[in-house]
């Protein structure tokens, strides 16, 4: 359905437009996207005529500050946090509204010789302030446009325009696919762009290493930090990991289960079972700081409250506005590669974890079950994971 990110990057490099689609649970829209330094009046005219949305120019915060172009409002209450700045025209424009004068303004925004006094405010081009870190920090069209320009080896700025149908409503995916076919444009998703960056960029660095004696044996503990978010994770290593395949457990943080002994989940029991087995056989345990299946500790407690009222763990997440599972495993894959592990036997009941690790280049040769006997408090939770989340659990 979607084109390859590599092909889209090549089109951006050649000055072509593509269509970028975001998540159906977000804005669920498609934008025409191209590199700002490649724009022409014909491109802007196409966007105005066929896209029909607002023509905007995503740029880095650094560049906007250099040009003295600041945010439109001090208190941004937009629910998607779209970071509009004051609109601008290039000083030599007449009205600034024509496709060709708008293209001129865009070109001057990315011209290294431009100065703050070269732009009048307000104008007819709407710069957008992209977040540092791009789609890995905010999964929006603003960040996607800048990321694509950078990946194409061009200046970090794009031109975007929403695609609106003839009847005035937003074009959704079926409409966008037809639009792409009609005009011969490639179409990609922000989700695929995120995966591409996670797979091809180094996003974690090793910070510290020490010996860690435990009741399950003597481990080596290695501390890692995510480069963009500063989030911290650890890996516990036991024995000779050069003998592949290596036994691996990737465990997501659960304060209530791992530390406080909660009976509502099987997390703590799984953690200790994994440490015991790795202590005996050798291997690696990666401990990821993605509490509550990625929603955080306080939201997890809110989800517990909803479960007390009768909702299951999936329904509780959705009620709070989250997907059933927000976890992702690209960082774990990068940690394992840094350690030197490529071929693994993975201790998990979660087939999604296996799929993601394979997508990120690890050779998963075996799934090792890690089932815990259910108790009165977590039986419904485990049954929900099996029936609604596809976990491979036999005991419930």
From Swiss-Prot:
Mind naming one GO cellular-component term on file for this protein?
cytosol
Q: Which residues bind Mg(2+) 2?
A: 27, 141
Q: What is the protein named? A: Riboflavin biosynthesis protein RibBA
Residue positions annotated to bind Mg(2+) 1 are 27
**Any matching Pfam family:** DHBP_synthase
Co-factor requirement = Mg(2+); Mn(2+); Zn(2+)
The scientific name of the source species is Thermoanaerobacter pseudethanolicus (strain ATCC 33223 / 39E) (Clostridium thermohydrosulfuricum)
Return the NCBIfam families for the record: PRK00393.1, PRK09311.1, ribA, ribB
Tell me the active site.
Answer: 325 (proton acceptor), 327 (nucleophile)
The record's Gene Ontology biological-process terms are:
riboflavin biosynthetic process
Q: Where does D-ribulose 5-phosphate bind?
A: 26-27, 31, 138-142, 162
Q: Any keyword DNA-binding?
A: no
Member of which family? In the N-terminal section; belongs to the DHBP synthase family. In the C-terminal section; belongs to the GTP cyclohydrolase II family.
Residues engaged in binding Zn(2+): 254, 265, 267
Query: Which region ranges are annotated with the description GTP cyclohydrolase II?
Result: 200-396
Residue(s) at site: Essential for DHBP synthase activity: 124, 162
Cysteines paired by S-S bonds: none
- Keywords in UniProt for this one? GTP-binding, Hydrolase, Lyase, Magnesium, Manganese, Metal-binding, Multifunctional enzyme, Nucleotide-binding, Riboflavin biosynthesis, Zinc
| GO molecular function annotation | 3,4-dihydroxy-2-butanone-4-phosphate synthase activity; GTP binding; GTP cyclohydrolase II activity; magnesium ion binding; manganese ion binding; zinc ion binding
UniProt pathway annotation: Cofactor biosynthesis; riboflavin biosynthesis; 2-hydroxy-3-oxobutyl phosphate from D-ribulose 5-phosphate: step 1/1; Cofactor biosynthesis; riboflavin biosynthesis; 5-amino-6-(D-ribitylamino)uracil from GTP: step 1/4
Query: Entry cofactor note text?
Result: Binds 2 divalent metal cations per subunit. Magnesium or manganese. Binds 1 zinc ion per subunit.
Can you tell me which residues bind GTP?
249-253, 270, 291-293, 313, 348, 353
Q: What is its EC number?
A: 4.1.99.12, 3.5.4.25
UniProt keyword annotation of Signal present: no
């Amino acid at each position: 359905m979607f084109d390859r990110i590599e092909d889209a990057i090549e089109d951006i490099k050649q000055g072509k437009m593509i269509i970028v689609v975001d998540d159906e649970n977000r804005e669920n829209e498609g934008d025409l996207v191209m590199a700002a330094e490649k724009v022409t009046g014909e491109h802007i005219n196409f966007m105005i005529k066929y896209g029909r949305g607002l023509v905007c120019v995503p740029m880095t915060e650094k560049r906007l500050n250099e040009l003295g172009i600041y945010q439109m409002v001090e208190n941004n209450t937009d629910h998607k946090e779209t970071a509009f700045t004051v609109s601008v025209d290039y000083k030599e424009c007449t009205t600034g509204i024509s496709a060709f004068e708008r293209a001129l303004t865009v070109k001057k925004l990315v011209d290294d010789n431009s100065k703050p006094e070269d732009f009048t405010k307000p104008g007819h081009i709407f710069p957008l302030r992209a977040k540092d870190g791009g789609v890995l920090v905010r999964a929006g069209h603003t960040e996607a446009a800048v990321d694509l320009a950078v990946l194409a080896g061009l200046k970090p700025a794009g031109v975007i325009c929403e695609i609106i149908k003839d009847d005035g409503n937003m074009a959704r995916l079926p409409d966008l696919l037809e639009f792409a076919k009609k005009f011969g444009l490639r179409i990609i998703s922000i989700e695929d762009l995120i995966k591409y960056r996670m797979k091809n960029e180094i996003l974690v660095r090793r910070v510290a290493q020490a010996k860690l004696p435990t009741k399950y044996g003597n481990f080596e503990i290695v501390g890692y930090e995510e480069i963009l978010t500063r989030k911290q994770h650890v890996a516990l290593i036991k024995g000779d990991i050069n003998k592949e395949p290596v036994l691996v457990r990737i465990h997501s943080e659960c304060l209530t289960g791992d530390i406080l002994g909660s009976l509502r989940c099987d997390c703590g029991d799984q953690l200790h079972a994994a440490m015991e087995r790795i202590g005996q056989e050798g291997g690696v345990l990666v401990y990821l700081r993605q509490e509550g299946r990625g929603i955080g500790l306080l939201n997890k407690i809110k989800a517990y409250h909803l479960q007390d009222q009768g909702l299951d763990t999936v329904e509780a997440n959705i009620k709070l506005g989250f997907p059933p599972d927000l976890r992702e495993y690209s960082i774990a894959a990068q940690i394992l590669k840094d350690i030197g592990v490529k071929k693994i036997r993975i201790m998990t009941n979660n087939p999604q974890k296996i799929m993601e690790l394979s997508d990120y280049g690890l050779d998963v040769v075996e799934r090792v079950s890690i089932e815990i006997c259910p108790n009165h408090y977590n039986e419904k939770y485990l049954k929900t994971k099996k029936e609604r989340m596809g976990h491979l659990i036999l005991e419930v």
